[in-house]
Amino acid sequence: MHGESPIKRRESRKIWVGSVPVGGDAPIAVQSMTNSDTNDVAATVAQINRLEAAGVDIVRVSVPDMDAAEAFGRIKQLVKVPLVADIHFDYRIALRVAELGVDCLRINPGNIGREDRVRAVVDAARDRGIPIRIGVNAGSLEKDLQKKYGEPTPEALVESALRHVEHLERLNFQDFKVSVKASDVFMAVAAYRLLAKQIVQPLHLGITEAGGLRSGTVKSAVGLGMLLAEGIGDTIRISLAADPVEEVKVGYDILKSLRLRSRGINFIACPSCSRQNFDVVKTMNELEGRLEDLLVPLDVAVIGCVVNGPGEAKEAHIGLTGGTPNLIYIDGKPAQKLTNDNLVDELERLIREKAAEKAEADASVIVRG
């Protein structure tokens, strides 16, 4: 039952990706990217639906050629969540997906080609109200910047980004967001800090090619956590060599830990020791699996003994403290005693009841407001 986040977010211009606001006073949007073959429409739609069920706000889809562009158009008709088309090199692909209803174009103006081609893409985006993401990556910096700096640096990333920002602004286009990604945490953080001071556009945060599920989660949590804690960032994507649904889960967990956005259960659990009166690890694994469908923000404490249990339980909506017998707290007050028999079943029941009660109360406040 913790309060609002103490973080003061950087002021930025608000843009819209489909129905999702990004920047300004909008909640930080959670993104992911499909890793299916875009030409396999059924598989890509199924993956997007899974991402949407996990709570994703925006999904990016790679569109490498014209066949994929046509597939993208069919995919767009079959899903509800806003879609970003990831496009490189061939400006005609951007023009085609704009015709097919894309919600955002992810391009690098530096590899689209001549000025007239960039202008054609910008005109198509402007005519249809489509925003653009300028995506700068340490692994694909322009050759002149590689020569100037010798290697990727925060300054090189920012110079590349500003070059493209100025390009769009010369074309009188302001409806864009920017990312400056690197796989090195320090480089990415430094680049975003520099860029945040120089532009007002919303920033898309990410540590690119972060790694597998565990290592990538840690890298992303460290890098994005540093930036988000400073108020930098308007939308995030956790890049993992894993099921894209895991990217969404990790993204929400990072935002929940900083109290920037709440969705589903925020578990507070001890690592367990010989004082535990029930199997904390097993209990947590079962609860997390059973309660993934709950979207209502709730703090649930699962503590194995009485050393820290009562204190943590009193701060949660639902708290379990190990003892003889175990004790359940609801809204900070002792509510009932539990034995280890059917412990998880009973705790799940109480959590679901509390979630329903909170959802009804929240809806009532919205209606009265």
UniProtKB/Swiss-Prot annotation:
Residues involved in [4Fe-4S] cluster binding: C270, C273, C305, E312
Keyword Oxidoreductase (UniProt): yes
Pfam families for this protein: GcpE
Keywords per UniProt: 4Fe-4S, Iron, Iron-sulfur, Isoprene biosynthesis, Metal-binding, Oxidoreductase
Pathway(s) annotated for this protein in UniProt: Isoprenoid biosynthesis; isopentenyl diphosphate biosynthesis via DXP pathway; isopentenyl diphosphate from 1-deoxy-D-xylulose 5-phosphate: step 5/6
GO MF annotations, alphabetized: 4 iron, 4 sulfur cluster binding; 4-hydroxy-3-methylbut-2-en-1-yl diphosphate synthase activity (ferredoxin); 4-hydroxy-3-methylbut-2-enyl-diphosphate synthase activity (flavodoxin); iron ion binding
Gene3D superfamilies from the UniProt entry: Dihydropteroate synthase-like, Sulfite Reductase Hemoprotein, domain 1
Catalytic reaction annotation: (2E)-4-hydroxy-3-methylbut-2-enyl diphosphate + oxidized [flavodoxin] + H2O + 2 H(+) = 2-C-methyl-D-erythritol 2,4-cyclic diphosphate + reduced [flavodoxin]
E.C. no: 1.17.7.3
Enzyme class: oxidoreductase
Keyword Transcription appears in the UniProt entry: no
Cofactor(s) listed in the protein's UniProt record: [4Fe-4S] cluster
Cofactor annotation remark: Binds 1 [4Fe-4S] cluster.
Function according to Swiss-Prot or TrEMBL: Converts 2C-methyl-D-erythritol 2,4-cyclodiphosphate (ME-2,4cPP) into 1-hydroxy-2-methyl-2-(E)-butenyl 4-diphosphate.
Family designation: Belongs to the IspG family.
Protein name: 4-hydroxy-3-methylbut-2-en-1-yl diphosphate synthase (flavodoxin)
Source organism (scientific name): Pseudomonas savastanoi pv. phaseolicola (strain 1448A / Race 6) (Pseudomonas syringae pv. phaseolicola (strain 1448A / Race 6))
Gene name tied to this protein: ispG
